[in-house]
Every structure is written in structure tokens, then in C-alpha cells.
């Protein structure tokens, strides 16, 4: 996170807008690569700084890397986020296993401040694996489902069984499904999105997909009917999505959205 701020402030990809037009909703998404609950408080300090400085309304993220059942009440995500402001949301993790406190994976999405009054419901991945979390803004004929998700990638040969991929493999293999966790993830997520669209909801999907956000399998499926969902960052910034890590060469994280939201 520190490196990202340095790049942005020194002319890197994108910009840090300090003002927000009236009536706009600002959504922030990041792969935290561990929030460092109990070990790296600077990450939450910096996150809270950005929330205030950029007037963030909804924070979404993945790889929180915390089993929230193993930390006390004062260390829960909503208790640490945006002190003094109203918050409403979900921090999800794999509840099907009790591995360790700094458990790989996890997703979260939280509304901050006045936007909380517009959150009609919220939830998480029905399997209990924490693959995604979501909230819905509005209700009736005008509502938007905002999903924060993490699509796992296959680990190397030296992994020790604790990766997100391996956690999900164990869960589905126990149910007789031997497909790749990434394949199952895509199927389940598209089922959820299809149901939301059928109920008239708009979609925002903030995701670390671990595959190209233009040519990857998920991106290709999202462009097709009935989804018609595309990457929104290009429309918002006029530029293609940058590499998702300052030292990387892959575009794997973005925010997809229904047409007409921006």
C-alpha cells in the first residue's frame, strides 16, 4: 500500500482525486495481501487515512488473511475501520476450516458514513469459504449489488496446504467435485450474478481475478448475455487497466460493472 501511494503521488498510473462531486459514490478496491491484524497496524492506519482523505463511501478488498473468529471483538474489521463513522458491511473468511489466525484468503465490503442508510441487505459466499462478500444499495426497482471477490490461482509445488486454492479444493473434493476451484468459482459467481440481474439489479464486481481482466475466461463470460458486464476503469479514467502490481506484468484486478452505472 505504501508503494502504491508513492507511485501515484510521483506520477504513476492514475491519480489521487481530492474532491468528489455531490451525489457521487466512491468505491475503493484493493488486494490487501494481509491486513496484518495484530501485527501490522500501519496497513489499517493507511487504509483509514485513504478513506478520510479520498472521501471513500464503500471499501472493498480481498486477501484480508484473517480468521475473524480467532480475534477479539475490538479487532474485528468493522471495529477497526473508519473510527467515529457509521459502518455497515461484511468481512468474510473460510469458516469451513480452522487453520490459523492469519488464514489465507478472505474478502470484505463495507459502507462508510451516510451510504449506510442506503444499504438494504448484505451477505457472503453461501459455501462459507469467503470467496466473495456483497452488499446491496437501494431496493425495489432501482438497486445495485456490489460484490468483492477473490478468484484463487493454482499454487506451486512447494505449498503447504494453506493456500486459498487448496482450502477450496479440500472443500469441494469432500463433496465429490474434483474440478479446479477456479472453475467452480466462476460457475457459482456467474450463477449469483445471473440471479441478481434477473431480479433487476445492477452489478458492480470488484475482483482480483488472477487472470487477465480483458482476455481471461471470467472477463469473456461477463461480456456475454445475459451479463453484458465490462471493465469500468477504462470508462472512468480513459486508460486501460494498469498492471495490478507495480513490479508485475499482468492486469488481474479491476471493477466490472453493468452498463449505465457510470
Regions found by a protein language model. Give the residues of each.
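Metal-dependent phosphoesterases centered on the DNase I-like endonuclease/exonuclease/phosphatase
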Residues: 46-96, 163-261
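Short, basic and Ser/Thr-rich N-terminal targeting/leader segments
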Residues: 23, 54, 103-104, 250
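Active-site regions of metal-assisted phosphoester/phosphodiester hydrolases
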Residues: 1-45, 113-226, 262
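Structured beta-strand-rich core segments of catalytic domains in phosphoester-bond hydrolases
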Residues: 65-154, 255
Amino acid at each position: 500500500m505504501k508503494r502504491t501511494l508513492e507511485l501515484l503521488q510521483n506520477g504513476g498510473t492514475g491519480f489521487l482525486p481530492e474532491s468528489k462531486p455531490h451525489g457521487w459514490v466512491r468505491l475503493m478496491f484493493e488486494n490487501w495481501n494481509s491486513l496484518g491484524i495484530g501485527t501490522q497496524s500501519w496497513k489499517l492506519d493507511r487504509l483509514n487515512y485513504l478513506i478520510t482523505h479520498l472521501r471513500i463511501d464503500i471499501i472493498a478488498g480481498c486477501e484480508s488473511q484473517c480468521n475473524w473468529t480467532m480475534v477479539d471483538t475490538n479487532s474485528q474489521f468493522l471495529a477497526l475501520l473508519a473510527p467515529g463513522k457509521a459502518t455497515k458491511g461484511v468481512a468474510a473468511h473460510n469458516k469451513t476450516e480452522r487453520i490459523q489466525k492469519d488464514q489465507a484468503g478472505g474478502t470484505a465490503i463495507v459502507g462508510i458514513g451516510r451510504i449506510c442508510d442506503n444499504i438494504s441487505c448484505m451477505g457472503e459466499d453461501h459455501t462459507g469459504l469467503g470467496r466473495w462478500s456483497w452488499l446491496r444499495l437501494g431496493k425495489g426497482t432501482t438497486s445495485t449489488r456490489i460484490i468483492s471477490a477473490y478468484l484463487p490461482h493454482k499454487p506451486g509445488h512447494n505449498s503447504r496446504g494453506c493456500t486459498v486454492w487448496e482450502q477450496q479444493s479440500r472443500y469441494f473434493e469432500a463433496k465429490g467435485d474434483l474440478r479446479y476451484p477456479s472453475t467452480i468459482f466462476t460457475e457459482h459467481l456467474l450463477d449469483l450474478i445471473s440471479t441478481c440481474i434477473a431480479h433487476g439489479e445492477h452489478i458492480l464486481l470488484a475482483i482480483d481475478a488472477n487472470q487477465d481482466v480483458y482476455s481471461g475466461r471470467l472477463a469473456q463470460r461477463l461480456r456475454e448475455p445475459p451479463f453484458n458486464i465490462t471493465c469500468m476503469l477504462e470508462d472512468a479514467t480513459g486508460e486501460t487497466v494498469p498492471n495490478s502490481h507495480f513490479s508485475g506484468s499482468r492486469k488481474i484486478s479491476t471493477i466490472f460493472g453493468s452498463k449505465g452505472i457510470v
